[in-house]
Amino acid sequence: RAKGIFASLSPDEWEAASGCGGWRVQDVAQHMAAVFQQIAAPETIDVGDSGKSEMAAEVPVGARRDWTAEQVSAAYDEWSEKGVAALAALQEPPTADMVVPISDLGTHPLHILANAIVFDHYCHLRHDIGAAVERASILPRDPDALHATVEWMLAGLPQMCAAELGAGPDQ
C-alpha cells in the first residue's frame, strides 16, 4: 500500500505538511524507509545513540531532508523489500522467541518486531500522510494488519506506558 501511495504522490503532495509535527509527507516516507533499513542493515544507517525511538527517527530523516522525492521512493522500494525479508527471518524459531530490548519501546520477542512495523505503517499512512493526502486516509482496513497492530499495542503499552497505566484513572 505504501508503494502505491508513494507512486501516486504529486510534487505538492510530497512537500505537504504531514500529521507528524515538523515533517512533510516526504519525511514520513523517508522515516518508513529508514526503519526498514535499520532492520535489514543496521550498520548502514545512523540513528544516533539516544536510546529514544522518537529521537532515533529524526536522525536519518534530518540527514536526508534534501533528498528528492524520487530518492525517497527508491529508498523505500529497496529497503522495504530487504526489511520485509529480514522480518520474515525473525519469525522462525529459535530467533522468533529471543527477547531483546527495542530502545525505549520495551523488551520483546523478536517476532513481534514485524507487528511494530505494521503498526508504524498503519499509523503513518492513514493518519500522518493521510492528514495531507486524503486517499491515504481512506486506505482499506486490512483485518490482518489491524490484528498485528492491536497485538503490538497490547504487547507494547504495558512497557511503554507503565507509569501512566500504574497511576490509574484520574478521580
Spans of model-derived segments:
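Charged/polar, solvent-exposed surface patches and flexible loops
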Residues: 4, 41, 74, 78, ...
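Short alpha-helical functional segments enriched in proximate histidine and acidic residues
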Residues: 5, 35, 86, 124, ...
